[in-house]
Amino acid sequence: MNEQYSALRSNVSMLGKVLGETIKDALGEHILDRVETIRKLSKSSRAGNEANRQELLTTLQNLSNDELLPVARAFSQFLNLANTAEQYHSISPKGEAASNPEVIARTLRKLKNQPDLNDATIKKAVESLSLELVLTAHPTEITRRTLIHKMGEINNCLKQLDNTDIADYERHQVMRRLRQLIAQSWHTDEIRKQRPSPVDEAKWGFAVVENSLWQGVPNYLRELNEQLEENLGYKLPVDFVPVRFTSWMGGDRDGNPNVTADITRHVLLLSRWKATDLFLKDIHVLVSELSMVEATPELLALVGEEGASEPYRYLMKKLRARLMATQSWLEARLKGEKLPKPDGLLTQNEQLWEPLYACYQSLQACGMGIIANGELLDTLRRVKCFGVPLVRIDIRQESTRHTEALGEITRYLGIGDYESWSEADKQAFLIRELNSKRPLLPRNWEPSNDTREVLETCKVIAEAPKGSIAAYVISMAKTPSDVLAVHLLLKEAGIGFAMPVAPLFETLDDLNNADDVMTQLLNIDWYRGLIQGKQMVMIGYSDSAKDAGVMAASWAQYQAQDALIKTCEKAGIELTLFHGRGGSIGRGGAPAHAALLSQPPGSLKGGLRVTEQGEMIRFKYGLPEVTVSSLSLYTSAILEANLLPPPEPKDSWRHIMDELSVISCETYRGYVRENKDFVPYFRSATPEQELGKLPLGSRPAKRRPTGGVESLRAIPWIFAWTQNRLMLPAWLGAGTALQKVVEDGKQSELEAMCRDWPFFSTRLGMLEMVFSKADLWLADYYDQRLVAKTLWPLGKELRDLLEEDIKVVLAIANDSHLMADLPWIAESIQLRNVYTDPLNVLQAELLYRSRLTEEQGKSPDPRVEQALMVTIAGVAAGMRNTG
């Protein structure tokens, strides 16, 4: 065990040493000494030395304004380097990869050992695999794209240094490159100067495809194919690619006025342009590789006399010319020029697939399978995974925007006010219009700007090439009319196909009503005819947790999914559950494998569709090797969940969960909504107000510019509590409820639930993870430095509650310390704490100075403001999840 970590620790200390040399070269010995002193004090304070803890506080409080930024940057950059080393460790032969026998192989062996499963059943489950990852631009990806690129390069250096056969002069070269990269990072500003636009966010998404997924996906499929051949004697069909990517960047307009119909149109074009760019590179390689002469009569007929001497190359060159023509046309469109479509414009995947597949079949038939299964196979699989659109886009809009648009239309037509009608009247009107042959929209009508925007967006969907838009998600969906309204607006825009429209249920009440809403919809004949046996429903994790606390929210999510699965099964509808999980626990994040196996039985039959958010995209898909490992984890979890579904919970367990849910929700809301001191405490004990200044995402932090906690988006709400280490949204209410049930004499029942029910054990595991990252003395320090004395009792009460909660969870899980079953994560948190602690203390100090300046009516000191931004980014890196 320790041998594994020693490789990680030595990489971390080596990177730290190089960073130290860089700081010394840039700023002189005295700053490096200052940083080193703070690091040593922090280490000793972590080990329990109280005197050194006090000295640490004094040292950081006494830093001059000139020293603030260098010290903050030193610890922040160190944490980025530690994260890079850790990411490398997860794929290095000396690290996790060594102790982690191939995850898919392990799952296949486990499945083969089940007496009631045969190879044919397993093969069928593999063939129905479907994984759709939806990349979202959450404002939580704090690290700039330029630094992410440098971190990737550092990773390559670590890989080269791991090679035992490396010659001395090569080692010196790699070390020199490492020093250059770390120096470049040090001399780069880590905080963006302005907010990214939605187009910038989309480009960030394309960069992930280019730098990692493009290579990672074919590698993952090779890995999967090898394991299936070895364990089942089964080869993946060439056209079988179970994974696809969709993006919300440029399509998600919920609460983001910056995402307009024009932006979506632009991003769709940009995405196609990027696809032609990447496929051109592939085809360029194939033109040079496929110089073979021998071909089947079919292929020779396809190329004619002109291409007979080098048939494969001839076809590739023709495809290259089409790609280039398509790219030029897209470039002109992006510049706003209106050009006629050229001959051979690529708009559908088949146009790419056919010439490539013809070459593949011919090579196979002529005994050149080894060549066919090289670069050509990788490109074919990319066509299936990415294709002409590169990534498909989801459109997301809030339900009230559709209601308001229809209200405006009905008022203009003089048939009443749609907004004030009852649900029954709305449904009757919508179904009548959906069945009508005449258009609803009047010809020369001038809608308001908001309504025009909604109608324009529907037009973009209707005009986009088929297959480039994946789904229309309705946030804050509450009623059947919310879904029918979108279908009507799409019909009016002239859409020629049935677009999947997914209601998103995200508050506690909406989750509890989800089954009822879907049952009503499925009872409408017109609707049943439209959806052709398929329905997608999105489950919101972050808003329900913010509304009711994690325990009540996770039980409501479980029950909603369970009820929807059963309703759709009965109705003969294939249900795809779309999970809107976040990276952090308060937004539903959990290690993928555990999270999937803790869902209700049958929840993955329709495949898995899940959001991958902000900073999690980098941790899970930042490098091709990490991509392979993340996709393999998902694959094995889906196979296992479908073939060895978790048990149906006993009725007594359901009753206990109902009880836990009620108590925890009351406790949570008792503080967050009903305690008059809570909002002022939250505003002063966390950097919530200052977070608004960080130029993170393109989306405003609040749904409405004024208002309390309820109007805050779920992400800043969680981000703020992560910064002061109280981690409140991820645990408040849960432990109190567990304690109450234990006092009622049900501890042994809770222990059984923990042992035998993945849903419950995952909940406790997630609480342990949060408790490991929370820190009482730091949360206390924020209070002392920033909070009015009258509010101190509330802070103390919350910290006492946290301490109690930790004891309760450990007792139920029968563990002596947190994270006993995941030592690797515990180790990683401990490793980072030494560097995160000084940033937290410094942040409290900076918040104090910044607020004092504001109170005195002076203008802010740019050194303080800049250092504050760096500590926020640094703590986020230390916690490995922002919001």
Curated annotation (Swiss-Prot):
Cofactor: Mg(2+)
GO biological process, one term: carbon fixation
GO-annotated molecular function: magnesium ion binding; phosphoenolpyruvate carboxylase activity
Active site: H138, K546
Pfam families, per database record: PEPcase (PF00311)
Record-linked PROSITE patterns: PEPCASE_1, PEPCASE_2
Enzyme superclass (EC): lyase
GO cellular component: cytosol
EC number of this enzyme: 4.1.1.31
UniProtKB keywords: Carbon dioxide fixation, Lyase, Magnesium
HAMAP family: PEPcase_type1
Similarity-based family: Belongs to the PEPCase type 1 family.
Protein function: Forms oxaloacetate, a four-carbon dicarboxylic acid source for the tricarboxylic acid cycle.
Protein name as annotated: Phosphoenolpyruvate carboxylase
Gene source species: Salmonella arizonae (strain ATCC BAA-731 / CDC346-86 / RSK2980)
Lineage: Bacteria, Pseudomonadati, Pseudomonadota, Gammaproteobacteria, Enterobacterales
